[in-house]
């Protein structure tokens, strides 16, 4: 009896910041892997999400948003990570937002014109478009920009047409052995996922108050005798004022962040979590490439 064929390949998800790439990845995987937040520029690492369904294994590369501004070291590195994700993939999903088209979208498009892989255009947040009459002409405009494999209007938030994207992905996976066991959903360590969860909560609860000069180091991640994990997280900010902001009045803010992060960790790790958080000022880290390397920002470049 002949063995069943298997299919496996890499799929890059690209687009300018804040168009819904991480939400789309989470929806395609059926669970939360990449951090989502209303702030642009929240994805800093190329998180690999793995989705295995029968003979098909799609390995998703979730890029940081490619963006025009490259002044700070962290932004240069994020752009470099996003650009290097476009090479060596079987398929690219280019995510744009509703009827908006910006210079940043144009820049991503220009990079994709050189890509060898076919490109699916996912027009996200179509449910938010107020003037529905504007949608068709905009889709026609997009279709004229390059030869897309397909153009799919989606809502990553509600899941509308995400299955259509998944079906196109399956169709274009080459015949190959699976790279990962079928129960894998990401190749990132639990320590890394813990830091991402804390960072998401910082973005969520501090919103526009806090600039991007915040990162999280996991200083301790150990199993305990209760069958759970003891995790110590260090939140690094650039200025004393930001430290006060993260801690909040009488520690209220950091307490909320800790409670919410712990809930998500327990759900992800399927085990009890004891989480402790500290805040420390480390000035200039977002401008210093050496500091970024020490924080693991360039481990995959």
From Swiss-Prot:
Annotated region G3: the residues are: 62-65
Chain intervals for the UniProt region annotation (G4): 124-127
All copies of the KH type-2 domain together span 206-283
Record's bilayer topology term: Peripheral membrane protein
Q: Which Pfam families match?
A: KH_2, MMR_HSR1
One GO term in the molecular function aspect is: GTP binding
Q: Which UniProt keywords apply?
A: Cell inner membrane, Cell membrane, Cytoplasm, GTP-binding, Membrane, Nucleotide-binding, Ribosome biogenesis, RNA-binding, rRNA-binding
What is the name of the protein in this document? GTPase Era
Q: Please report the organism this UniProt entry assigns to the protein.
A: Klebsiella pneumoniae subsp. pneumoniae (strain ATCC 700721 / MGH 78578)
